[in-house]
Amino acid sequence: MNNNIELKMHILEKYGIATEPKSIEFCREAYKFVYGEQSSEEVIDITADPVAVDLGLPSGTKWADRNIGASKPEETGLYFSWGNTEGHKAGMDYDFEDDYDNTPGAKLTGDIDLEHDAAHVNLGEPWKMPTKEQFKELVENCTSERTTLNGYLGRRFTSKINGESIFLPFAGYIDGTSLSNHGSDGYYWSSSLGSSAYGYNLGFYSSGVYPAYYDNRFYGFSVRAVQ
């Protein structure tokens, strides 16, 4: 059984983003071809849709319970450069900095639209990337603390309004091909443009939580969807 699981994981890694419908279907068909049977629910778990968490926020915004590409709330998931919908896992042969100028996101001169929205493209309606204003609303209406979930370090945001919470792992970020600050910091893209070179993001470090920070658009950050 363990060999079966490893093969399914290998297929997912090799043939695309786990959250893309075409990749999911290909993986299931590939598994059926190899084993002569339908894939078991372990594959479905890997590609499970996020759950919308209602924190009672004034705007009515609901937050996903996990990062894009994560099968569980505590997992890192995929990393995205700003304005691009193709995510990458840490350790893959992809250079976020060198390749950025040739991506669709590099050509954006305003906020991210739906065509370039990693949440909308990978998860479908009604999911979108959060704006910097939605990050501000999250921070203003929640308490937050550094904590662990099933052994993963991160920060839990708990609503001051209804007590519901979401956990954001310390996924770190990718600069070029190097993963940095994994397990100590979190960086989450918004859809809001900072400048020609920067995008706004939620950043949290040992020094505090910053809902409207901005960083180089070519960095590989996490994406947490909203609806």
What are the functions of these language-model segments?
Residues 11-12, 55:
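A short beta-strand micro-motif
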Residues 49-51, 55-227:
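C-terminal, surface-exposed recognition/capping segments
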